[in-house]
């Protein structure tokens, strides 16, 4: 079943509390962005300043060049999924091992220019691949690049059980195309957070995606 995950992308605790309260009122699975200005062009609220209700399923998108530097903090926060970048530095196998030991699923994000061949050798370790079509570190302002759906097809062919996420430019006019293209988890930021009625915006997305 397709999941629509509202995203939380903030630089301070007040924004975090506000966006978390909004997104948590919509669904149980949430996508939270982390950035230290090494991979994405700006810093976001650090993981050590975050907390969330224990009954929520949290996906952490780690836009950090050296994710190993915050490995212990990531594990202590107890998300259900941690997504590191294929473009980051460090040993993915070691990171994956530590996450798996702590019952955390392993995800890898691919920026637009990054081919799927980068992650193919590690698919046995990976639970989730995030196809990124947005502006790294920001909410809204991006458009969907439908040519990136070819990555979804390539990954699903290589590992049919792999969960595929999408991040960037999603709205009620294009979400159905992403669902038809094989995307399992659709992360949505600006369309929800910037809406005059976020609850109605989320409902429109569900209807357009065919989620009852």
Where are these regions (language model features)?
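Conserved N-terminal beta1-alpha1 strand-loop-helix module at the mouth
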Residues: 1-81, 89-91, 98-100, 105-106, ...
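Generic beta-sheet signal
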Residues: 7, 61, 109, 132, ...
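Flexible, active-site-adjacent loop/turn segments at secondary-structure boundaries
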Residues: 37-38, 136, 168, 190
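Long, low-complexity, intrinsically disordered polar/charged segments
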Residues: 71-84, 152-156, 164
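Glycine-rich phosphate-binding active-site loops on the catalytic face of alpha/beta enzymes
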Residues: 86-90, 130-141, 181-202
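Active-site/ligand-binding-proximal alpha/beta "capping" segment
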Residues: 130-135, 142-185
């Amino acid at each position: 079943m397709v999941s629509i995950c509202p995203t939380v992308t903030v630089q301070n605790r007040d924004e975090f509390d506000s966006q978390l309260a909004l997104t948590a009122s919509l669904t149980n699975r949430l996508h939270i962005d982390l950035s230290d200005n090494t991979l994405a062009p700006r810093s976001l609220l650090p993981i050590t300043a975050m907390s969330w209700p224990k009954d929520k399923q949290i996906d952490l998108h780690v836009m950090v060049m050296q994710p190993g530097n915050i490995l212990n903090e990531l594990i202590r926060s107890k998300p259900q999924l941690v997504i590191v970048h294929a473009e980051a530095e460090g040993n993915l196998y070691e990171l994956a091992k530590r996450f798996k030991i702590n019952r955390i699923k392993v995800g890898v994000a691919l920026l637009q220019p990054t081919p799927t061949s980068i992650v193919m050798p590690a698919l046995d370790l990976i639970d989730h691949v995030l196809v990124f079509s947005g502006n790294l570190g920001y909410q809204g302002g991006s458009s969907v690049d439908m040519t990136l759906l070819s990555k979804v097809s390539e990954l699903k062919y290589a590992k049919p059980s792999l969960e595929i996420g999408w991040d960037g430019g999603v709205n009620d006019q294009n979400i159905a195309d992403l669902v038809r293209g094989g995307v399992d988890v659709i992360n949505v930021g600006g369309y929800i957070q910037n809406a005059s009625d976020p609850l109605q915006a989320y409902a429109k997305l569900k209807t357009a995606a065919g989620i009852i």
